[in-house]
Amino acid sequence: FEDLLSPLVSAHAKRGEVDEADQVFQRLLDTGARPSLRALTALLNAYRYAGEAGAVFRLWDHVFRVALDTCRSTAPAASGADAPVAFDQRNLLCLPLSIVIDFASRSGLHDRVAQEWNRVKRAGFAFDPHNWNHLCAALARADRLGDALQVIEHVLPHVPPAWERGMPVRAPHAAPAAHAEK
């Protein structure tokens, strides 16, 4: 059911229909299934679009615990409860973290951005380029443009465009040269 219902939660979220998103999510819970991080993230996004701060942060705390529990349940038994996050699970919180950073910074909760970023970092999770972009936007909103520019310059990867590297540039829908008709 989750594969059917999670996209519906996301669709309602994008339209700002938080009550409808809640109803669909409740239908998922009524099936007896434990909602995945994907489903929880869809609901988190609905709360973000609705501007419901209490709901965003309550659900974020739950998402964070679920991610930690997921990592611990798949960790080797010998590694213990405080085992580091496995490499293949380090990105579990990337999307929900971006949602929380965006919401907190747009709400003027700049200290909360730092708090949640550090919480995720201490737990051993990784950040993706979207997280870093959201952090840059949050820093700019907090009037910390210099820090945002430092992240852009030193953290975000910069791959020059093909034309700058002397590579041939082709139209977006053109076939690659090796497969072009002769």
Regions found by a protein language model. Give the residues of each.
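A basic, Ser/Thr-enriched alpha-helical scaffold prevalent
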Residues: 1-182
